[in-house]
Amino acid sequence: SGSCEMKTCWKSMPTFGDIGQVLKEKFDGATEVQSLKIGSRQQLVPTQRDFKPHTSSDLVYLVPSPDFCEEDLKVSIPVGLTFSHPPNQGSLGTHGRRCNKTSKAIDGCELMCCGRGFNTHIEEVIERCSCKF
């Protein structure tokens, strides 16, 4: 009948939100590992024996993150297979920091205060304002 069929294929990137969701899931399921010499090769092995071995697409880490809620000035940064303690690094914690009571973002009191609760402080400021009408 003279009709023809044409098929076109292309690849497209997932949305930024989809990529973020995959990364968040990988972060939440990350496995702490240690570098061990097995035979003549260095291998990354889970620190917890009951954890399954990781795959090449899993997220792994050698050093746990500091507790950002509490002060933790001791940070170990892997350098090769040894660890160094650089000065002026770590976490000062969140005690005493100002937060936004109504925010659900990282500046919000619920998140920043790490479940410890927070004090509300109301301050009234009276200023002279050279207003002209």
From Swiss-Prot:
Modifications the protein undergoes after translation, according to the UniProt entry: Palmitoleoylation is required for efficient binding to frizzled receptors. Depalmitoleoylation leads to Wnt signaling pathway inhibition.
- State the Gene Ontology BP annotations: Wnt signaling pathway
Keyword entries, A-Z: Developmental protein, Disulfide bond, Extracellular matrix, Glycoprotein, Lipoprotein, Secreted, Wnt signaling pathway
Q: Which residues are glycosylated?
A: N100
Q: Where is the lipid attached (O-palmitoleoyl serine)?
A: S1
Alphabetized Gene3D superfamilies for the sequence:
3.30.2460.20
Q: GO CC terms on record?
A: extracellular region
Annotated S-S bridges: C69-C114, C99-C109
The yes or no answer to whether the keyword S-adenosyl-L-methionine is present is no
What the entry lists under InterPro entries is as follows:
Wnt, Wnt_C
| A molecular function (GO) term | signaling receptor binding
Q: Is Secreted there in the keyword field?
A: yes
Intracellular or extracellular location(s): Secreted, Extracellular space, Extracellular matrix
> What does the record give as the function of this protein?
Ligand for members of the frizzled family of seven transmembrane receptors. Plays an important role in embryonic development.
Concerning its family, UniProt says: Belongs to the Wnt family.
Output this protein's name.
Protein Wnt-4
Q: Which organism is it from?
A: Strongylocentrotus purpuratus (Purple sea urchin)
Q: Give the encoding gene's name.
A: WNT-4
